[in-house]
Each structure stands twice: as C-alpha cells, then as structure tokens.
C-alpha cells in the first residue's frame, strides 16, 4: 500500500498537477453537444425544412435518417430539435421533442409509456428509464396507448418523437410500435405527432410491414461518412476547447483524422483517438501529445473494442476461438478451417457442448473475421479444392483471458487436453 499521505490529495496528486495537456476533455466525449456541426449544414437544413410546419401547428412529415456510426445523425437531429423548441417558444406555438434511445427502450410498452410520461418535460431529462406516471409493467398495451393518446390531446400542439437506433426496437419487438405511432394522428383532434427514426442499418426496413414503411419513410435523409479533411475540421474545433494551447503536435489531428477516415469516416472514433492520445500523454507526464501517443491510443482502443466484442460472443463462437488459440500454442501461426474443426470437436466433447457441423463452424469463423478478431483468406489446393486459412493479427493473451471467462471454457479438463496427440494428427 502506498504511504503517500503528504497532502489531502494523496495518491491522486501526481495525476492532477500536469495541466499541460487538457483544458476541458469533456468536449471530446460523445455526449457533448457542440453549437456548430461542421459539414452537416445540408442535412440540418433539410431536417429543419421538413419540421418547419410544426411552427404553424401543422403535421411535419415522418423522417427516416440513415448513416454509419459517427456520421453526426443524432447530434444533427438534437440540434434541430432544440432550435425547433426555441423557435416555437418565440412564435407562441407548442412544439415538444422527445428523444428515445431504442437500444435501451426496446419494447412497445416502454416506448409508449416513456412518451406519455415525458410530455410535460419531454427533452429535459435522459430518456433511458420509464417515468413515474405509468408503471414500468403491469398495464395492457392498449391501455398505455390510450393513456398516451389522452396525454397528447390534453397537451396539444406538435410532438416530434425521435427514435434513435430504431432498428434495435424493430429487431427485438417487431413493427407493432411503429404501426401504432404512425397511425396515432388519425386518433387525435388537438395534437399532432411526427416521427424521426435514426438507424445505422439500411436493411432494417426489410423487417417492416409495407404499410408501416410507407408511413414512416415519407422523407429519407442519408448522412454520408466524413472524409479525412472534414474530420480534421471537427477535431480542430474540439481541440481548441479541449487542449491547452501548444499541447498538440501538428501531426496529431491529421493522423487521428486519417485513421478514423479508414474506419468508415467515424467522427466518434476520431474523437476517441484524440482524447485517448491526450490521456496517455497526460498519464506519462509528457509535455505534449505526439504522434506516438496516437499510435498507442489506436492500439488501446482496438484492444478494448476486441475485448468487449469477444466477451459478448456465444459459447459456441468462443469454443471455435479457443480451438484457434490451442493451435497457435502448438506453434501454428496459420491454420485451416479443417484443423480448427478437429480441435473444436475435442473441446466440445470434453465440456459436453453440442457439436456443430463443419459448415456451421466455417460460418462462425467468417463472423470472427468480420468482427476483426482474426484474419482469413481462401486458398486453392488444386485438385484437393479450396480451404480457408486464418491467423491472429496481434498477441493472443488478452483474447485467451476473455475467452476463458466463460464458465464452460474455464474448465480444468480443458487444461489437460492432450496437445501432443493433436500435434500427431496434424503431421
């Protein structure tokens, strides 16, 4: 235990004395709402033009907004929503915005209850838990719908309902929620509802009834990925608020932007790279943030993302991954799908796991490749046909640590697996 008791700050003193890096790191976080959104004026103007009828108490068209992660969809919609509420206050009309995160609020009951309970203070508090007026469970859904309708009627005006990550709601609960919301205007006399759906997944509309899709997608807006120069502008804007003047080497922002541009133009990734670079420089008490800190940040973020990804895999996928780890421990840097299948079957037999077919194992290998956990390539073996080879791109100690957290794979019997017998099989 440390005996650093020389000041009230004790253990933390050395981490608080270096003020050469950050001025306000919070502006680099995803939940920060900038006053200016670079390179999104066309999309913001389009959303505003669609919602403008709300200011004259008319019903705006419903909007579906698409785009990859980190393309400014949510920030732009929130910005327009705030401006709409401000303009409505000046115009003497009533416009309310309610923003729901459908990754959290992913059932019809919770969506309807959240909207109804949030009408009085629709956008003043986070919308990640059901409010107090309607119980979290217990009412029939049609009663919740009726309560929402009554609340809307008594409130009057125009309500814009933003369903962020709408695809998560549809995939979990179907399209009943959207069916009810898109037809609610026909049940209202004194209020009007407009829906904005935000999605990273263009294909989620395949799950929708054609009538729902037709009502929901009256207007569609696509947010393209940012390119490297655009990401530079975004980072420069935030860096001026986040960092002490002169703390960043001139190569840092262009490098963060270039790396994030390779990741589908993701502004969140660019901001994470810049923030983590600064944090690493801060922790080592450096005088500034250099290119090496960006490289270190990239490696750290990729490792953290991989750990999270692997930890959520089903046991069968982890068993396939564990088979690859065993092959690597046997000295094989590159291994085939056939070899993975042999070792996987040994693992499945030992821990009483249902044995998958070779075809299904190949599918799981493709998924691991798509997630970036492994690399694969298909090679031709002439008259013997084609096979898939795979290998790990980085050190596997962290991967093994995460895989063996699964109780089924943290099995003493697996530690006694006869590796020599397996080696003999592959000679």
UniProtKB/Swiss-Prot annotation:
Keyword annotations of the record: ATP-binding, DNA replication, Nucleotide-binding
Residues reported to bind ATP: 71-75, 226, 238
Short name of one Pfam family: AAA_22
Molecular-function GO terms, alphabetical: ATP binding; ATP hydrolysis activity
One BP term from GO: DNA replication
Similarity section: Belongs to the CDC6/cdc18 family.
Protein function: Involved in regulation of DNA replication.
Protein name: ORC1-type DNA replication protein
The species this protein was found in: Methanoculleus marisnigri (strain ATCC 35101 / DSM 1498 / JR1)
